[in-house]
Each structure stands twice: as structure tokens, then as C-alpha cells.
Amino acid sequence: MSKIVKILICFLVAVVIVIMAIFCYFFVGRAVIAEDITWGVDFSQMQTEVLGLNWKETYLAIINDLGVKNIKIHTQWDWIEGKKDDYYFNDIDWQIQQAKNKGVKIIYVVGIKSGRWPECHAPAWMTSLSDQQQKDKVLEYIKEVVLRYKDNGAIINWQVENEPLFKFGECPAWYYDDGEFLEKEVQLVKSLDSSRPIIISDSGEQSNWFEAAKIADVVGITMYREVWAHITDGWGFYIKSFLSPVTYWRKALLVKKFFGKDVMCIELQAEPWASRTFYDVPLAEQAKTMNPDIFRQNIEYAKKTGLDKFYFWGVEWWYWMKTTQNSPEIWNEAKKLFQQN
């Protein structure tokens, strides 16, 4: 056997060993299950209205009937500043006041990309501005929000943008190209309010979370188990995540070790992810990616990740199913969980 062949074999063996070690680290074993888990929900006024619901009724039901004590509020810039320099905060004021009245803790999402399609919610008037002018207006908007609410005790965290490092959604061309803008946003928030930890969210499945950890005080991640894999406009397929619960735990350990940051789940799938917007497909199609059994499975899966904070994505859909489809099963299942929390 020649020397070159021996070297090649040794190299291949080393590669296999490294691959096996990586696989074992991220997929083999069990996480230490947290003794005290916090459960919350993500809430979007826009989403409730898209579903044809009364958003105030829905919000109050979340607090008073479900008994939720932790809410992440998704706000849309185009709703707040539909007219340039004319801010409308009445609806957000109401949401935060209701939370404060009931001792509910709020995570406030601020920025241009704040969740729910089309992800970036830029006002129509912004399109006539240059890229730099658009960035300046985003910072002005953030400043208005933080100064308005920084003295409100209901808010426990600012989340700057929603998955800003994950290229998904309809956003201005500069949004993902300017690698420093997110840091400018975070620096601005910290300069206005240094008392609250800042969350930067990232894809739980398609990222190592390191870039978010460099900027954030707390890393927020997503956790989606049953989704539609969109290949083209006319073709795709349903897929179930192959990730082990311990994958999230081990990634969180790396973030803690190298960056000293905690990781929390700010989006735990609890609504359908269908081939089209879920309210445009039949209930039978919706049930392929979310139903009471999948909901319970996702809760048990989440517990096994070792994380101790989870916010459900889909509470508006639960209420829609309960009040318009006579299907309160997930709402009632969640209610039992929140009563224990």
C-alpha cells in the first residue's frame, strides 16, 4: 500500500470520526428537563383581524379565560405610522394596559420586521425614500416606541426585529444586506432603556444561533415540527422535522459557553403550516400539521429540549377554531397547561 493511499485512508477515517462525533453531540442523549417552565403566547392584532375575529375580545379571552401570564406582542409599523410622522398607539396602549391590570408580562417586538406575513411591515409612504432615509425612519420609529413604553412595568423585554438574520419575507432590499443595521437598532434601544434585556430571535432549525448571540442579551428561537416545504409556487410537500430535542439543548449549551447568553423559545408551533395560508385551506388540510394530538406532542417535545421558556405561535387560531369552527379542543388543552403555570 502506497504512502499516499495510507494518508488518504487516515484522512477519511478522521473525517468519519469527526462526523460521527458531531452527530452524536447534536442527536444522541437527553437534555436536563427544566423544573420550572414558563409558557406564554405570541399575539398579533393583525392576525386576529385577518381571521375575522374581534381582536379585543380575543385578547381578553387569552388573559381572562386561558389565564396566560406571558405574552409577546407583535406590532406592525405600518399600522402605527400609516401616515408619516403621525403615530397611532391607541391599540397598543390598550393591550399593554390590559396586561398590566392582570399582572401579565409583555415582550414587545419592535422594528420593521415584526412577524406574520409579509414579515416586514413597512408603511407604504416609505417606498419613496432612499435606502438611508428608510433606515433613519426605522430608527425614529423605534425611538418613539421605546420612549413611550420604557417606564411601563408590564414590559419585561424588548425584542428587536423578528428573525432579522433569517432571510424570509418581503423586506426592503437593504434589510439583509446591511450587516450593521441590526446592531445600530440594538444600540439605540440600549441607549434609551438599559434596564431591559434585548431579545434577538433566530431560526431554531436553520441556524446555529451564534450571530444572534453576538448581538442579543437573550437568544430567542423558533421550534416548528410539522411544516409545508415550499419548493415552487405549484409544488411542495409536508415534512416533519428530524431534529432531536437534545439538538436544541446542545446548541443552547454552546451559546451559553461561548457567549454567556440564555436561549428561550419565542415561537413554538401551535397552528397549521399548510401549502397556502392556513385559513385558505380546508380544516382537514390544516389538521395535517396541527391538531390536538400534535399540539400535545409538541408540548412534550418542547419539555425534552431542556429550555425553560416557550411562547406558543397560534393562539389566534385556537380562538378562531373555538369560536367559529366549534372546535375548542386545543384552546381547552392549552388552558389546562396555563392553569398549572
Each language-model region and where it sits:
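Active-site cleft segment of glycoside hydrolase catalytic domains centered on the general acid/base Glu
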Residues: E81-K84, E119-S195, D202, S207-W209, ...
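Boundary/entry segment of secreted carbohydrate-active catalytic domains
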Residues: I22-K69, H74
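N-terminal Sec-pathway targeting helices
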Residues: M1-M20
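Aromatic-lined substrate-binding rim segments of carbohydrate-active enzymes
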Residues: K56-T127, P172-I199, K214
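Conserved, mostly hydrophobic/aromatic
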Residues: I63, I71, A99, V145, ...
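Substrate-binding cleft of secreted/luminal carbohydrate-active enzymes
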Residues: I156, D262-N341
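Glycoside hydrolase catalytic-domain groove-lining segments
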Residues: Y176-G179, K184, S191-F278, E329-A334
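Hydrophobic faces of well-ordered beta-strands that scaffold small-molecule active sites
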Residues: W39-F43, I71-I73, I106-V110, I156-V160, ...
